[in-house]
Amino acid sequence: MNCFGKSACLALALAGIVGAAAGDEDQAQAGRQVFDQRCRTCHGGTARADLPLGPSLAGIVGRRAGTGASGIHSRPVMDSGIVWDRASLRRFLSNPQREIPGTLMAGSATNRAELESVLDYLETLH
């Protein structure tokens, strides 16, 4: 492959990376809208829980279930041993009672696209 061919391949690869990042940002923004409509009442704002109900979801990815400084943590969640990642959050948000019987979590995801966008949003919270 000549220099031009290598440069063209690199440019296309970088364009794909930039395009994917922009798509991820769009998905996270869509997830924030779903979060604001369906989750914020119990889990509060983006950086911390504003209400003493559900725990703050800031920094949820990589955190052990049932830990965090704010909100109510149910014993079943604390005893679950789960460390939240995208897959465990997907299972839990799809059917909280099936994943952790006895959890206080009341809501669940209604469709896959909204669930994936909320997961994208949760991954942005630190």
Description of each model-found segment:
Residues 32, 44-83:
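Gly/Gly-Pro-rich "capping" loops immediately C-terminal to redox-active cysteine motifs
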Residues 8-17:
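Bacterial N-terminal signal peptides
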Residues 16-34, 45, 49:
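Electrostatic cytochrome c docking/interface patches
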Residues 85-126:
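C-terminal capping alpha-helices of c-type cytochrome domains
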Residues 31, 36-45, 118, 122:
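The canonical Cys-X-X-Cys-His
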Residues 1-9:
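Bacterial N-terminal signal peptides that target proteins for export
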Residues 29-36, 50, 58, 87, ...:
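Sequence context surrounding c-type heme c attachment/ligation sites in exported
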